[in-house]
């Protein structure tokens, strides 16, 4: 009898121990469980090319996601890669994101965003694009207000007329304007057409030179000098941006001011960059991604975010080399800008203080 009681007591103790063990296992669940464990979101970011503008966007996306994660008590597990303009590499990067079952993709620049859209059509993975100049023209969205599908993002739409105004504010007597761009860049198409219309209406001669490689861009810059243009306009063109450090001296030494569609051009040696704040563009891209993942926002109804185009960035070193007085130039530009910044030539924004 005594042995029977002891055996029953031991059995009860073992049973209770098993119950406590199972409870402990249940309370220590995975990342997506309740309790103290943070929710984990997997985000895949693909950059189109290594240049100052796009790198600045990526850096700010990553920093803002980290800040949001700390504030909201969640974790963003970010996978980042750069395809460096290689379509095959781009395809592989995006395919890897799909295979990894990421919760959201971010495509930096138009070509990446377009390929992400195509490859995710049969999935439920939302895509947030960044630095797409013409989202409607690229057929990424139905409209800026109502994207219509699982794709939305931020646009660096460029007001080409505003840059034309700056060109003629600087030189009212300019008779010949050069357009330097890559015909293969979708991001350049709308701005180039707008510039052509402006210049044609004004009766100004247009000189076009294009390039799709660094060597071709250099030859195009040299051709601008040979043609004696009064100024050069370059839109938000990643091919020219990548070659800017190699061509800026050619134009500056010839006394030709280059007006371009991003502050990164001025950083890399153009006389003036005009357009959006790319650091802020990155922050807002991250905010949209977080809104979709954390708050359940629907990309189909989450409006594309556009920005004030009114910031002009003047490279003061090039300004001096061209023989301009900065104060005179800044005063001439004031009616056409909401803000004027200055910068000196460097490879990246981390190398210089504005």
What kind of region is each of these model predictions?
Residues 26-28:
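Bacterial signal peptide processing site
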Residues 43, 61, 152-202, 298, ...:
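An alpha-beta-alpha
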Residues 79-142, 237-252, 256-261:
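Beta-alpha junction/loop-to-helix N-cap segments that form part of ligand/metal-binding clefts
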Residues 291-354:
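Hinge/cleft segment of the Venus flytrap/periplasmic-binding protein
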């Amino acid at each position: 009898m005594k042995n029977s009681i002891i055996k029953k007591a031991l059995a009860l103790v073992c049973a209770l121990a098993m119950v406590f063990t199972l409870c402990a296992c249940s309370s220590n669940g995975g990342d997506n469980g309740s309790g103290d464990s943070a929710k984990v979101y997997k985000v895949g970011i693909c950059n189109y090319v290594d240049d100052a503008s796009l790198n600045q966007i990526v850096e700010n996306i990553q920093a803002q996601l980290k800040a949001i994660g700390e504030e909201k008590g969640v974790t963003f597990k970010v996978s980042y890669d750069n395809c460096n303009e290689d379509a095959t590499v781009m395809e592989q990067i995006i395919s890897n994101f799909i295979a990894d079952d990421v919760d959201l993709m971010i495509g930096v620049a138009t070509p990446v965003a377009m390929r992400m859209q195509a490859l995710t059509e049969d999935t439920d993975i939302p895509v947030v694009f960044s630095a797409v100049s013409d989202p409607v023209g690229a057929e990424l969205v139905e409209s800026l207000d109502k994207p219509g599908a699982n794709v939305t993002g931020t646009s660096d739409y460029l007001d080409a007329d505003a840059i034309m105004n700056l060109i003629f504010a600087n030189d009212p007597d300019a008779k010949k304007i050069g357009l330097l761009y890559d015909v293969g860049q979708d991001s350049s198409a709308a701005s180039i057409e707008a510039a052509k219309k402006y210049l044609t209406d004004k009766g100004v001669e247009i000189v076009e030179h294009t390039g799709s490689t660094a060597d071709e861009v250099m030859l195009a810059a040299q051709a601008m000098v040979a043609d004696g243009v009064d100024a050069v306009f370059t839109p938000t063109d990643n091919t020219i941006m990548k070659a800017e450090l190699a061509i800026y001296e050619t134009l500056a030494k010839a006394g030709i001011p280059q007006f371009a569609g991003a502050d990164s051009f001025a950083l890399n040696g153009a006389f003036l960059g005009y357009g959006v704040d790319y650091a802020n563009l990155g922050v807002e891209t991250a905010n949209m991604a977080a809104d979709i993942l954390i708050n359940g926002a629907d990309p189909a109804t989450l409006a594309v975010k556009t920005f004030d185009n009114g910031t002009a960035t003047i490279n003061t070193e090039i300004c001096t080399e061209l023989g301009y007085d900065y104060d005179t130039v800044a005063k001439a530009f004031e009616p056409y800008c909401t803000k004027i910044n200055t910068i000196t030539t460097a490879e990246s924004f981390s190398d210089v203080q504005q």
